[in-house]
């Protein structure tokens, strides 16, 4: 999963960076999962935090890099016309991972993922899309590709160190997530 220059993460030929907002969320979730594992080595795999971490890793480092331009990641006008170029991956009904990509350079930036305080809920003040739009309007994360990439490259060594650490306690959960078959269309 690592490659390119030292400290970078490369998956399916795409270099992946994480904005500091995403890194902070990923780090907090890893700490939470590790604490749960130390308290309950057998039962932590069934906890929401462990499943969420496994889903985030699977999306960010497996599914999205397979085809970041996929129509399943288009978010339409939910963020407003000015932010239509942002993509989002849905997981566990109310969670969204927001990202951008640049095809020519084969680069993906994972920008932000909502948490339990900002679950997707139509017309809620704390809705994931509404919260992310506020973050974009405040300039953090930046909307400009160049500024977003610059802000995210500073954390690439942290991401490279954190990703295997995060993957270790969630490997069993991740295998279960990968083997789930999608529901058949009606």
Can you name each region flagged by the protein language model?
Residues 42-55:
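A short, highly charged nucleic-acid-interacting micro-segment common to nuclease
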Residues 58-90:
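A short, surface-exposed loop/turn module that caps and links secondary-structure elements
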């Amino acid at each position: 999963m690592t490659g390119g220059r030292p400290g970078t993460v490369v998956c399916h030929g795409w270099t992946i960076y994480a904005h500091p907002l995403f890194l902070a969320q990923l780090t907090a979730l890893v700490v939470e999962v590790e604490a749960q594992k130390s308290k309950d080595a057998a039962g932590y795999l069934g906890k929401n935090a462990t499943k969420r971490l496994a889903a985030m890793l699977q999306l960010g480092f497996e599914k999205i890099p397979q085809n970041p331009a996929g129509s399943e990641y288009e978010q339409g006008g939910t963020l407003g016309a000015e932010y239509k170029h942002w993509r989002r991956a849905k997981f566990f009904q109310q969670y969204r991972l927001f990202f951008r990509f640049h095809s020519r350079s084969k680069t993906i930036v994972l920008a932000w993922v909502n948490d339990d305080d900002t679950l997707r809920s139509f017309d809620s003040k704390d809705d994931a899309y509404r919260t992310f739009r506020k973050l974009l309007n405040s300039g953090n994360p930046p909307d400009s590709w160049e500024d977003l990439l610059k802000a995210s490259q500073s954390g690439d060594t942290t991401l490279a160190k954190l990703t295997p650490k995060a993957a270790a306690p969630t490997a069993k959960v991740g295998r279960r997530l990968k083997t789930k078959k999608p529901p058949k269309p009606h």
